[in-house]
A protein has these predicted regions:
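Positively charged n-region of N-terminal signal peptides that target proteins for export
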Residues: 1-5
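Short loop/turn and low-complexity linker motifs enriched in small/turn-promoting residues
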Residues: 22-80, 84-202
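Bacterial N-terminal signal peptides
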Residues: 8-17
Length: 202
């Protein structure tokens, strides 16, 4: 009897002491609205939880600020877009060709190199390894709307303007001087977007 009591007590302690894994998301969070495409910026590595990535357009207006295990949603009309993703001392240029009714995922994270952690942007392309791991990448992330970030959304980047311009020019230089494989790595085309049927299969 005493043994059974200890087992029951231990099981109860385990259940109370280990927090349940929060639901990563509701699938509906990622459905594109009528006539628009949805872009989801994922920053969800524990090691990066204190880091913030800033995403802005070529007019230097902020469209997203992602940090702390977050999946931030941005809705856009169809058409080509150039975005710049800034993290630490690095800025990366990416190009998107979103299609209405589809959802595109971009993972923001760091990779470890000899000189330390380096920011990286990984575009989730259809049928890629990242596509297959998408559920894992989203697990535990808080879904937010970029338009709710009043400090960022649609505001010009005024702080450290000269430094921002320099990094933007460097990112454009990397794009221009890179080969086709480099540009392909940082480009999402229409077919890379997930349909409503794809998202239903998450």
């Amino acid at each position: 009897m005493r043994s059974a009591w200890w087992i029951t007590t231990w099981l109860l302690a385990v259940c109370l002491g280990v927090p349940a894994s929060a639901a990563a998301y509701d699938k509906d969070d990622f459905l594109a609205p009528e006539g628009k495409a949805r872009i989801v910026f994922i920053q969800n590595q524990r090691v990066d939880r204190k880091m913030t990535f800033t995403v802005f357009e070529s007019d230097r207006r902020c469209v997203a600020e992602v940090g702390g295990r977050e999946a931030q949603v941005l809705d856009v009309f169809p058409g080509p877009y150039i975005f710049y993703v800034q993290g630490y001392n690095d800025t990366r240029r990416i190009e998107l060709f979103p299609m209405a009714g589809r959802t595109y995922f971009i993972r923001l994270h760091t990779v470890t190199k000899p000189m330390g952690a380096v920011p990286e942007v990984t575009l989730v392309r259809r049928e890629s390894e990242e596509h297959m791991r998408l559920r894992v990448s989203l697990e535990g992330a808080l879904v937010t709307q970029s338009r709710d970030n009043e400090k960022c959304y649609a505001r010009p980047l005024k702080e450290r303007e000269n430094r921002t311009n320099r990094r933007l020019n460097e990112a454009n230089g990397d794009w221009k001087n890179g080969d086709d494989a480099y540009r392909d790595k940082y480009t999402l085309i229409e077919r890379d977007g997930l349909t409503r049927q794809d998202i239903a299969l998450f």
